[in-house]
């Protein structure tokens, strides 16, 4: 659920999710939702597809074909590619986006930047995420009116391995007196915390939620703060 003025939503999931949004007050008024109840690509009036190599020197090439709506779900798929040429390739380049001759993996990253921006309230995502080695699904928001990290970043969900141990994370970042220097507040919960309670955790859908007002940001997974 989203109501975050000057914040846009970025989804880098590798599987399915429906998305809702509510306004901020004690009775929760719905202000926007996307139930992904069409077939094919996402609505261009709401969603953008990131393209190519984007951030963090990651292995995947982002493209629209890997994110489609099917049967009321948004399905985002990571794929292993074979003999696919990187169109940006320049031999001897020092740019990580251009030094790779071949694209080894593709996936999708979709955002609402410039189309849906909100401030305060409740943001809720129902999703099933991949937990295979190498997976890095994420749901996060960025401010839209200045460069990172001064714009702020809220990571409602991330999953990846820390020193070989799978974790689910919730993070917030903001600017410092150094350009590109972020201050982070992070909570990393070992994945085993969830599978000890439910061995079938990975096969089920779960609800990630952010409650945000003028004083505090609270991030939940299945109502657990």
Task: List where the protein language model places each region.
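Bacterial N-terminal signal peptides that target proteins for export
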Residues: 1-9
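Compositionally biased regions
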Residues: 9, 16, 109-110
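Hydrophobic h-region of N-terminal signal peptides that target proteins for export
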Residues: 13-22
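GH16 jelly-roll
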Residues: 24-225
């Amino acid at each position: 659920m989203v109501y975050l003025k000057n914040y846009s939503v970025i989804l880098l999931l590798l599987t399915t999710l429906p998305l809702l949004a509510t306004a901020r007050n004690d009775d929760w008024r719905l202000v926007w939702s996307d139930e992904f109840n069409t077939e094919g690509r996402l609505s261009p009036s709401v969603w953008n597809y990131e393209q190519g190599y984007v951030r963090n020197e990651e292995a995947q090439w982002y493209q629209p074909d890997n994110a489609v709506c099917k049967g009321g779900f948004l399905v985002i798929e990571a794929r292993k590619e074979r003999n696919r040429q990187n169109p940006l390739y320049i031999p001897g380049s020092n740019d990580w986006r251009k030094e790779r001759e071949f694209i080894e993996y593709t996936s999708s990253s979709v955002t609402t930047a410039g189309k849906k921006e909100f401030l305060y309230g409740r943001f809720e995502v129902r999703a099933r995420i991949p937990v295979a080695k190498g997976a890095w699904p994420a749901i996060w928001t960025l401010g839209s009116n200045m460069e990172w990290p001064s714009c702020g970043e809220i990571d409602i969900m991330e999953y990846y391995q820390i020193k070989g141990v799978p974790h689910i994370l919730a993070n917030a970042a903001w600017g410092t007196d150094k350009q590109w220097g972020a201050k982070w507040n992070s909570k990393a919960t070992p994945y085993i915390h969830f599978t000890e309670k439910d061995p079938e955790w990975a096969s089920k859908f779960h609800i990630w939620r952010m409650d945000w007002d003028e004083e505090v940001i609270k991030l939940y997974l299945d109502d657990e703060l």
